[in-house]
Curated annotation (Swiss-Prot):
Species, as recorded: Prochlorococcus marinus (strain MIT 9313)
GO biological process: photosynthesis
Record's keyword terms, sorted: Membrane, Photosynthesis, Photosystem II, Thylakoid
Membrane topology, from the record: Peripheral membrane protein
Protein name, entry field: Photosystem II reaction center Psb28 protein
Length: 117
């Protein structure tokens, strides 16, 4: 269930926070206005057999509202689901800034850091 004390969460089914923290990689266009975030969730709880059919997108929820993407793809190993790969695309500097505000809140909630490669 959603945790009222969290300021940022990721959900694949509305109302159910995903506890598995993803690896996130960002890429931006040369002018910096557009780009994407690639999320990789290894063995997320949403892929359990009892919840598998409930994925409706990825919802990034924080105090400002929510960001949504429907680009959610499953990775299978030996016929069994092993990971989710999710792409979130932004198309303006304002969209990027909004995504980064969510990312900072999400990182703080999950004890994560940020590194630039």
């Amino acid at each position: 269930m959603a945790n009222a004390n969290k300021t940022a969460a990721i959900q694949f089914t509305r109302g159910v926070d995903e506890p598995v923290v993803p690896d996130i990689k960002l890429t931006r266009s040369s002018d910096g206005r557009t780009g994407r975030a690639l999320f990789v969730f290894d063995q997320p709880e949403i892929m359990a057999p009892e919840t598998w059919a409930g994925i409706t997108g990825m919802f990034m929820i924080d105090e400002e509202g929510e960001l949504v993407t429907r680009e959610v793809n499953a990775r299978f190993v030996n016929g069994k689901p092993s990971a989710l790969e999710v792409t979130y695309i932004w198309k303006s500097e304002a969209d990027f800034e909004r995504f980064m505000r969510f990312a900072k809140r999400y990182a703080a909630c999950n004890g994560l850091g940020y590194s630039q490669n």
